Amino acid sequence: MVRKPGSMYRNVRQRSFTRRKYMGGVPGSQVIHYDMGDKANTSFPVKISLIVEEKCQIRHTALEAARITANRHLVADTGKMGFYMKLRVYPHEVIRENKQATGAGADRVSSGMRRAFGKNVGTAARVKPMQKIFTVAVEKQNFKAAKEALWHAGQKLPTPCRIVVDEGAELVQ
């Protein structure tokens, strides 16, 4: 079966579905790392964040794609130890899909919308407006590279995003 488009899961329509105790076979999250770069260095003077502007659900595949993109841009521009990046959301929400049979004779096999609760197909993170998704800490000279990396990460997410400077705004003006 093909993966459904993200627009099917983007909007928050029903109440949260997170109790894995009662679900059989929840697929694991594809997000592997939540902290990247120089984890020991806490003295980076500039911190910038990627903020979502609308309430939505972000699939774990989109979070992983955004993380990989931002990490690749930062490593290429600042080096492996020139930044610290943190992914600040976790995909708790379990996404379901009511599989539909297609093709010849599907009407005999399929039950349509009867028992349409669906099977678990993935996980997603529910975010609120103005919630931080990624935070990047860098040196002053690497500010533009970090901003560009967050912009590229925002392009992978299903909601409009904005980049804000958390610390060190006076250094980068």
Swiss-Prot record:
Listed GO biological process terms: translation
A Pfam family it matches: Ribosomal_L16
Listed GO MF terms: structural constituent of ribosome
Gene Ontology CC terms, in alphabetical order: cytosolic large ribosomal subunit
Species in which this protein is naturally found: Methanosarcina acetivorans (strain ATCC 35395 / DSM 2834 / JCM 12185 / C2A)
Family matches, as PROSITE patterns: RIBOSOMAL_L10E
Gene from which the chain derives: rpl10e
Keywords: Ribonucleoprotein, Ribosomal protein
This protein's name: Large ribosomal subunit protein uL16
Record-linked SUPFAM superfamilies: Ribosomal protein L16p/L10e (SSF54686)
Similarity section: Belongs to the universal ribosomal protein uL16 family.
